[in-house]
Regions:
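Short Fe-S-cluster ligation motifs
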Residues: 102-121
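RNA-interacting cores
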Residues: 3, 86-90, 114
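Iron-sulfur (Fe-S) cluster-binding segments and ferredoxin-like electron-carrier domains
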Residues: 82-108
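Immediate flanking context of iron-sulfur cluster ligation sites
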Residues: 56-76
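Core of compact, soluble alpha-helical bundle domains
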Residues: 1-47
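Short, hydrophobic/amphipathic alpha-helical patches that form generic packing surfaces
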Residues: 40-48, 82-86, 110
Length: 121
């Protein structure tokens, strides 16, 4: 199992994943809501949109914009079960465990924190 840092470095080598960045609007939303709220949103999105064994619209359940967590999901290849399978070898067709959900949320939050530390793009 890779560390979060190793995973983020690997994701940066993907031209598609590396193109995602938080917008100024996303950054302001995070500042207004606070990281605790963003983390709760991330946990809720993962639990409801990614964790079920069967996701009816897999590959289309995560919008490309509209919330900082959505951007992080695409940047971290945690946007759909197909990407989770391709990048992290998480089997499709079974519910994500609580531990898997927590690891995904930690990865998303680490990506968001890194984006905030880098400043505006």
């Amino acid at each position: 199992m890779s560390t979060i840092e190793q995973t983020l470095l690997r994701l940066q080598k993907s031209a598609f994943r590396a193109k995602f960045h938080l917008s100024e609007k996303d950054r302001q939303y995070i500042m207004d809501k606070g990281m605790g709220t963003i983390q709760r949103h991330a946990a809720d999105f993962i639990r409801t949109r990614l964790a079920p064994a069967s996701v009816p619209n897999d590959g289309k359940q995560t919008p490309m914009r509209g919330h900082p967590v959505f951007i992080a999901q695409h940047a971290c290849a945690c946007c759909c079960r197909s990407c989770l399978n391709k990048w992290y070898h998480v089997p499709i067709g079974r519910e994500l465990t609580e531990d898997e959900q927590k690891r995904i949320v930690r990865l998303l939050m680490a990506w968001i924190e890194r984006q905030l530390a880098m400043g505006a793009k």
